[in-house]
Amino acid sequence: MSPSAPLSHRVESRELDRARLLSKVRGHAVAVSSVRDASPSLIASAEVLGESCQKPCPICHRKTLKLTRWIHSKWLGEKSGTARSVREIQKVLEDFAVAHAGSTASETDAELSIHTVEVCLHCKWNFLVRHEVVTPG
């Protein structure tokens, strides 16, 4: 087994931003149509790779809410900006740790980000609920 670099994780929860936006929607300061704009690729990735949520959609109240994860990194090349399952992301993180053993976070490709997006398959509500940045070290 190859040596791997310890990884540093910085997690930004966007739950407060989500709550603020939903409050504005309920107060009619933001149009419902403006938050029901999931792209076809986001919906498709949520259908195939998304994990079901226990909570209902905050807009249509159906239990069709999924969490889908997208990975981004120069290190990934063409695979950057793609949706992945939790298992696939774990494998990417393992490969990333091996590839960056002995490197420093200042290298341009030594950062990987994971975006977790909440998506409703019914009404197309979507919101970036979590942003995680992973670096060696």
PLM region descriptions:
Residues 1-112, 125-137:
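N-terminal pre-domain and mature-chain start segments
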